[in-house]
Amino acid sequence: MKLVRFLMKLTNETVSIELKNGTIVHGTITSVDMQMNTHLKAVKMTVKGREPVPVETLSIRGNNIRYYILPDSLPLDTLLIDDSTKPKQKKKEVVRGRGRGRGRGTRGRGRGASRGF
């Protein structure tokens, strides 16, 4: 299972997130998208070396997240079960006669070929 798919299951869980700049964000996850952008509510944001600031809602861009700190009470064994069904791959048909490109006549066909004009 991809990490992002696991994080998408954490809706309504209260977590702490440490950002790459050292800021720690503590709040309840409302959603996580495929780019790991995380949306939180009831947030307490502690910028490195400052007092905590309460924020109603906050969105964090995924590439700014260093790591998630999950609560100990989280049932990881049930969340890590991959419940998505994998689509069956179709067999590719062999297509012939498309390998030489779609150029202009005999141009670029090697030595001794006519010039094409």
From Swiss-Prot:
Keywords in alphabetical order: Cytoplasm, mRNA processing, mRNA splicing, Nucleus, Ribonucleoprotein, Spliceosome
MF (Gene Ontology): mRNA binding; RNA binding
Compartments where located: Nucleus; Cytoplasm
Region (Disordered): 81-117
InterPro entries per record: LSm4/Sm_D1/D3, LSM_dom_sf, Sm, Sm_D1, Sm_dom_euk/arc
Domain Sm, residue spans: 2-74
Comp. bias intervals (Basic residues): 87-117
GO biological process, one term: mRNA 5'-splice site recognition
Assembly and oligomerization: Belongs to the 40S cdc5-associated complex (or cwf complex), a spliceosome sub-complex reminiscent of a late-stage spliceosome composed of the U2, U5 and U6 snRNAs and at least brr2, cdc5, cwf2/prp3, cwf3/syf1, cwf4/syf3, cwf5/ecm2, spp42/cwf6, cwf7/spf27, cwf8, cwf9, cwf10, cwf11, cwf12, prp45/cwf13, cwf14, cwf15, cwf16, cwf17, cwf18, cwf19, cwf20, cwf21, cwf22, cwf23, cwf24, cwf25, cwf26, cyp7/cwf27, cwf28, cwf29/ist3, lea1, msl1, prp5/cwf1, prp10, prp12/sap130, prp17, prp22, sap61, sap62, sap114, sap145, slu7, smb1, smd1, smd3, smf1, smg1 and syf2.
Name of protein: Small nuclear ribonucleoprotein Sm D1
Organism of provenance: Schizosaccharomyces pombe (strain 972 / ATCC 24843) (Fission yeast)
Gene: smd1
